[in-house]
Structures are given as C-alpha cells and as structure tokens.
Amino acid sequence: MWYFAYGSNLNSRAVAEWCRHYGYRAPAMRPGKPAVLDNYRLSFPIFSEYWAGGIGDIVYDPGKYVMGALFDLSENELNVLDAKVNRKLDSNSKEIGTYKRIEVKVSNLGKSDSISAITYQGISVERYHIPPTQHYMDLVIQGAYSFGLSMMWIAYLQSFPLQQGRKPRPPGTGDAASKL
C-alpha cells in the first residue's frame, strides 16, 4: 500500500527514533520516491506539547500543492504510523484521534501518472497557524533534502514563522498529540 509522507514522517531517522522509544518496530520506509499532492497546502494548525509548537497537516486548497515522498508499506507498518500520529477509532470505527487516514492521488515526480496513496490529515477543524519549533522544521527539511525535493519547496518550508525560545519535550511527556 502506498503511503504519502509530507511532514516529520519524511524523516525516517525521526520515525525510527520514535518507534524505538515507544517499543514499535520501525516501518521499512523504503523505497521512498519524491511525489506531489496537488490541490492541498501544507499548514501547521495542530499544537503538540511534545514539539512545543505546531505540527504539519494538509488542507484542501485548489491550485496549491504539497511535496513529499511515497513509501510502499504493509498494513502493519501503516498501523505503526497510525500510533505515531495518534490515529484512533471509536467503537463505530469513527476516527477520533489527532489525525485520520485519507486516500489521495499523488504524482510521482518525473512521471505523469497518478498513484493512489494513504496519507494523514488532521481531524481538528481549527485552521489557524501555530508556529512549529526550529527542531521540528529541521526534521521536515532534512527529510525533504533526503528525497531530493526541490529547492523551491525547501525555501517554502524555511519561510514558515517559528516558535521562539521553546524546546521540544522529552519523549513520553505531554498531550495526546505528544507522540507526534
């Protein structure tokens, strides 16, 4: 199953570190291929106590795009990412956590065909900007570099206002979104 990563999940080292800390087997996160999600934009409307700032989300916005990477993951590997992003289901299979899975069409960079993929979108309806921390954005930008995403996209990532003087909390502390 294809998975489209666009935020801190672009950084496989950060995903592996989270998995190690919380006792999960890290997803293989290979092969990663640069990809584009059209008609969405990147935003930071979700506050995480762990990161001490905003964390990435996608918002439907015709004419905009989000760059990221495609990974071929098993359902078990996606379940690990579900735990990482705090995706939860109630007894009626309604998504009630911080993020929900959505199916999207993404373009593999350099190829014209679209691929169906799973990605995560925040459940919160609040859509104002919560500045991320420098540490969080560094992880996102390192992930973007590792997949050869465009310098224009990296400059865009660097343009977001950041939290000043706040440090991320140690793993295992904070709110329900602290695992993010």
Question: What are the functions of these language-model segments?
Answer:
Residues M1-L180:
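Glycine-aromatic micro-motifs
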